[in-house]
Amino acid sequence: MSFEDSLEGLCEKFRILKQQLSDPESLGVQAFVVASREYSDLLPIMSLIEEYQTAQKEIEELEGLINSTDTDAELVHLAREELYTKQKLIPKLKHQLQLSLLPKDKDDSRSAILEIRAGTGGEEAALFVCDLYRMYIKYAERKSWKVEPIGISTTGIGGYKEASLCIGGKDVFARLKFESGVHRVQRVPETESSGRLHTSAATVAVLPEVEEVDLKIDEKDLRIDVYRSSGPGGQSVNTTDSAVRITHIPTGIVVIQQDEKSQHKNKSKALKVLRARLYNLEKQKIEDEISKMRKSQIGSGDRSERIRTYNFLQSRITDHRINMTLYRLEHIMKEGDLDEFVDALIADDQANKLQQISS
């Protein structure tokens, strides 16, 4: 299919979606949600197509004006200048459209659930989980996204064995999905009297948040247990059975939620996480069928696997996937200024996809 045919196909799809959404009663609830999302995703692309096609028409008109024997010399000069500008614009617009035509992750527009867990490194790894958790909250605040803490499991010295949060907003998953993997930290722990450098690790999993209409969970597949929530050391922190443990029997996935005082709120949060994990599990199965070489999302948490290294002594953060190093670790972690990494990772992903299409 040619580039122009691809554009026409998108225009036709947009027309069909617009027609469907003009009569919402003809669609079911789930179909309406899907169509609305697709329509919203196509809007900026349609604007680009319109700009591209308008520029092409203007080039044709300018060329006709220049080649006409009736056009005076001054007008020809102005037309040539305008033609030069428009001809420079066409490749830029075409490149933007080529990027928009790349295979899309249908979950890119969704909100995201982040699950951060301590890997190798004991208490130091747990402290690093705490640092990452705060960094992602700061990043969300910079982007004006909504942050909803889901659950935190603390350690005795203020670290987190694991922490999860939901970050809401448009295209959150698109910008955060490349954070999935093993994050390695190199620093001297405060408890280390000899000043020896320690290496620890934490895993980050980024899951698209799934609405109930996107994934129905059969009640008979769930075992729901309630009990009294407990704090560090196992002491009870609640006199009612507010903590909730949900087991998805077919897959064995277990979600525990006890941060809220209300059993209803804990159950709601646990179901949100369960939906995201089940959706991600099904998505991974499909992707594994397409590419048997695909590795698991977060790895084992071993120090030897890593997507990014945070070296505190050198104030250095290195992303090993794109071989990019920035020397302002404290600013990035405290202020959540991740955009330079995120933008570079997105650009690298797009370049790889373009290369696959052209090869």
From Swiss-Prot:
Keywords: Cytoplasm, Methylation, Protein biosynthesis. Its main location: cytoplasm. It comes from the Bacteria. GO terms for molecular function: translation release factor activity, codon specific. Disulfide bonds: none annotated. Pfam families: PCRF (PF03462), RF-1 (PF00472). The modification N5-methylglutamine is found at Q235. Methylated by PrmC. Methylation increases the termination efficiency of RF1. The keyword Cytoplasm applies. One of its GO terms (cellular component) is cytoplasm. InterPro entries: PCRF, Pep_chain_release_fac_I, Pep_chain_release_fac_I_sf, Prokaryotic/Mito_RF, RF-1. Transmembrane segments: none annotated. The keyword Methyltransferase does not apply. It is found in: Cytoplasm. SUPFAM superfamilies: Release factor (SSF75620). Peptide chain release factor 1 directs the termination of translation in response to the peptide chain termination codons UAG and UAA. Belongs to the prokaryotic/mitochondrial release factor family. HAMAP family: Rel_fac_1. NCBIfam families: prfA, PRK00591.1. This is Peptide chain release factor 1. It comes from Anaplasma marginale (strain Florida).
